[in-house]
């Protein structure tokens, strides 16, 4: 390392940059040399020497960090002669992983100093991953998902996976954490994303009814009910004033009576909500099939889903501007770039160059949540056989409870013609037996989105099952049929 430091100093002097190497930080793949230039040296002069130094040092790639944040030094990252593999098992057996208390802990790998790097997906709150073929992107994605599965039970986290390549995520099929079998049909993938948006809206309505703001406080409140510390009838506090939203036709609809207890409080049985991780392995393919619908769903989830406990991981090997649009990029502050083929791809994913100089095979740059400086990490490695062993073990613990209604097509042509919908009869039974009609009540009882529940209520009004909203009753609809 000292010899390399002397050689680096010598080559820099040949280009008119004088100074000395003060510190050396060896890592599993690259070694960082902290170089302190002489006073008066322009940083821009050093930053443009990456390719020249790579040739002079006979190195595969040289990445320059100019300057190092908080220091009057410039960092030179030179590849090691012998790369070290970072096994995922080694990362997961570290004490720091055992003590990691995040809601969605993710193991990433080791930094350039050889220290384990962990993150919490719930704090990110969404992650954008890009990398060219052979960069290690798919293995890195497997590492992230496997680390979550190793830490969290199906009651704590559920997963919805979209795999246009068909083979990349199939190993996870059938584990109890899955909401659905891995989705490979792109048209069904759009339906799955729309369901995630509906589920987000449903959860926010539940939070509003319970007087909470996010999934964490909601689940803590549920725990109090289950432990007997909080009465069920106190779970939903009184709400004053008109609570409304727009239905599918743009009309204002009252969600619940304007005064008094939420009508569902007596019959409502609170349950803890699991976090949901939505994984899209090749986002570019999905955008080619249904760009408009997909982008709108991803943007809504990225903007609002954090507090509801729904988090998105998008991965693509083609980080062009037509795939990672400005709307998507603006809502994914945490991003990971494996090696890309050109500078423009690095600019698209990270907002700056650098990813084109990575070494591949798990070498990556990361923008941590809430930070502006890039962090270089070498991703942990997990083999396909190791992932299969983990998934086989999970399958032995129990069968998945699939929610096949996720992939049922939505009827967006208005309420007409939905009387053949099997949910319609269930909705009629719900309001008839309850003796009142509330869109939020139908939402919760049928586990559907707000728009779907609003359409069912409109159809029941057309069929004479319920009356129109009454302003005197605070928007309450009269049920015109008896209990079933």
Regions flagged by a language model, labelled:
Residues 2-5, 47-50, 142, 190-193, ...:
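Hydrophobic face of alpha-helices
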Residues 122, 149-192, 327-328:
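P-loop NTPase switch/communication element
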